[in-house]
């Protein structure tokens, strides 16, 4: 059986993270490297990062549990 290549998590440039805001609340975002998401606590949404690109569309975001 062939070994599967390991997928290294994407790293977000800290300067980019300073510039990005939640499109709904304009609040700051937190980077969750384990889940590859940008978290908006104010909107209670987690925006996915796919292939190193943050998907900042509310309809693509995952609702956060309370």
From Swiss-Prot:
One of its GO terms (cellular component) is cytosol. InterPro entries: Trm112-like. PANTHER family: PROTEIN PREY, MITOCHONDRIAL (PTHR33505:SF4), ZGC:162634 (PTHR33505). This is UPF0434 protein Mnod_1613. Belongs to the UPF0434 family.
């Amino acid at each position: 059986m062939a070994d599967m290549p390991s997928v290294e998590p994407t790293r977000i440039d800290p300067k980019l993270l300073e510039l990005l805001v939640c499109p709904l609340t304009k609040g700051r975002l937190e980077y969750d490297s384990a889940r590859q998401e940008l978290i908006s606590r104010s909107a209670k949404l987690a925006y996915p990062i796919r292939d190193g690109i943050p998907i900042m569309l509310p309809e693509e975001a995952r609702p956060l549990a309370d």
